[in-house]
Amino acid sequence: MAAATALPGFGSVSSAPAKQIIPDAGVFAQTTIAGSVQGDSPSLYVPYTGTSAAAIIVAEGAAINESDTKPLELAIRTQKVAVLNVFANESGAQSAASNGNVGGSGIDVVGMLTDGMKKTIIDKANAILWQNPAPTEGKPETAPTGLFNYPGIIQGGNITNTLDPIVDAIASISTNGGAPTGLVMNYGVWAYLLKLRDAEGRLIISPDVANTPTPALFGLPVHLDGMAPDGKILVNSIGDVYSATGDINIARTDDRYFERDSFGVRLTFRFGWGVPYPDHLAVITINKK
């Protein structure tokens, strides 16, 4: 976890690179950062090529013919994630910096409060990264679509009692030119996979895999996130998911809640993502018996 962020002073606003404050967010672990965004509802435009022309062999001194590849542009839409909490001044006074920790225990209460707010930001950011709905047909895209719901993604079939659909999805992505980098799922899905048994009653996934702090299947790291949807697995290709992120903005007010002897703290974070080649990702469904 990132180190606790000190609260700014009266009515002030401070900013910090989001990767320093919330490094565990999925956007930093499972996408490629293409640029930064600031301001009100901005978009980032990332150039890429369509169907790439094949390279050719050319004799020394011979002319090299131009390819017919046309440049395209990926529009990365962004959304702002925010949280506003109000705390009693008694809580704000109990910080290690002011020598007023709880019962002399040395606990930095302000740090604990802001860490809780950062977790709220991470959870919401991860939830929309994975699960944002696709736009309604015929309507323009105003927010990025969650990777599990991304239009054009490979539908990798259903897992019932074998892991074959994962193998097939990896093969399909590779055939399409992608490079699978990991499997994203929630803890319930991972638990279901760990309990799968073959016809002779033996666990399909070795206990050694289950017990390692960094599990992997078929050479791909398993990225566990409680905000991933239930009953689904994403075969991700980090190099094919481009994202844009802004700073974490932290603001404090001691005036608005004056009559309550309280202060307010606000955290905001803007980010978005896009996938130029959706068939470089796959989603697999779990059919639980």
Briefly describe each language-model feature range.
Residues 3, 48, 89, 187, ...:
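Residues immediately flanking
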Residues 75, 80-172, 283-289:
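Alpha-helical scaffold segments that mediate packing/assembly in large oligomeric complexes
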Residues 54-57, 86, 95-96, 192-195, ...:
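Short helix/loop capping segments that flank catalytic or ligand/cofactor-binding pockets
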Residues 14-29, 109-121, 125, 169, ...:
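Short, Φ-rich (hydrophobic/aromatic) sequence segments
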Residues 44, 81-87, 224, 267:
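Short amphipathic
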Residues 40, 146-258, 263, 269-271:
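Extended oligomerization regions of viral-like shell subunits
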Residues 1-35, 252-289:
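Protruding loop/beta-arch "assembly-hinge" segments enriched in small, turn-prone residues
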Residues 2-83, 161-164:
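Assembly/oligomerization interface modules of large self-assembling protein complexes
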